[in-house]
């Protein structure tokens, strides 16, 4: 085993996560219909600052992410600074790592803290699947550029005459991998077939996710970390995630048809995470800065790991790669964890990763490790449900998981938690958290 690499500043300060907050998550075209991601980001950061009672000028950096990019606001982070009353001199930039985007934002702020260039920052992400950048065809785009340079009406008409009717149709954002043409659901189907994961197993995991999430809301466990939002026409508050199906039964899941491989598949809309709108953010500081401000941190970021694998086959195995690396850097084993939280993009993807974490063969032949990372204890796994139930605004999910896990660790008296996610492009992310 290599030497552990816990995250501390040059002065020995740990990286403190002081607080975290998110909007409720809304299914596509429901409560946040028409609300762009930048406005969702402003909502959550503004409320996070108001609740924390931290002086606005104490925040020296904001790193924020958005996966579904809006051309009119390419640097969502800077727009949030300008739209929330933060100090205009606050450094702000945007990141994107697909479904692990807010993991990356947190890592970037942590690195600034370790470098000593800042003492406090905000990291997070927002996405809207209801406000999409609808584009134009490549043929129309090329003609429009040429028309802009044409000097006469005749030249412009000649250029437009080259277009066919199909060239005028709007082009929605791509849902497939650029390099392979595969949709995420196609990859989930690959994984189900490769690792022998049945439809019944997938439906059971999805049902478990919804039941746990519904119970978490019923017991008031999420009230402190989810804000109440008001959106036009401002008639009704939106305060709870609207995707959770607490009253569903396993029989309900069995009724749905496969969504991707319609003839032989097992991945359905019910055992996959839905398209979702929402935002989430966390405040990070050096441990000494938190003490100066009289703040008790939610917990600490002990370490993290990012990994990448090939995209052609089973590319959503990021957690099986990033988890052992993060544990090694933290100087921990699976047995040391109090909680283990994995992003549920699909039930098939989640179950495949769990299978490989406990596989001696995968550890030896693929990772080059002497032993398996370890079986994940069901009593520690996604104890409050996961993305299948809550939904998945791509750039916000990591910050949701971090905040949720730290609150639950506090309720349990402290300990270590690991949060991990797969991401498009064969990427993986894992972070080890600590609460006292």
From Swiss-Prot:
One of its GO terms (biological process) is fatty acid beta-oxidation. Pathway: Lipid metabolism; fatty acid beta-oxidation. PROSITE patterns: THIOLASE_1, THIOLASE_2, THIOLASE_3. InterPro entries: Ac-CoA_C-AcTrfase_FadI, Thiolase, Thiolase-like, Thiolase_acyl_enz_int_AS, Thiolase_AS, Thiolase_C, Thiolase_CS, Thiolase_N. It catalyses: an acyl-CoA + acetyl-CoA = a 3-oxoacyl-CoA + CoA. Its main location: cytoplasm. Keywords: Acyltransferase, Cytoplasm, Fatty acid metabolism, Lipid degradation, Lipid metabolism, Transferase. It comes from the Bacteria. It holds the Pfam family Thiolase_C. GO terms for molecular function: acetyl-CoA C-acetyltransferase activity. It is found in: Cytoplasm. Its EC number is 2.3.1.16. HAMAP family: FadI. Belongs to the thiolase-like superfamily. Thiolase family. Catalyzes the final step of fatty acid oxidation in which acetyl-CoA is released and the CoA ester of a fatty acid two carbons shorter is formed. Heterotetramer of two alpha chains (FadJ) and two beta chains (FadI). NCBIfam families: AcCoA-C-Actrans (TIGR01930), FadI (TIGR02446), PRK08963.1 (NF006516). This is 3-ketoacyl-CoA thiolase. It comes from Salmonella typhimurium (strain LT2 / SGSC1412 / ATCC 700720).
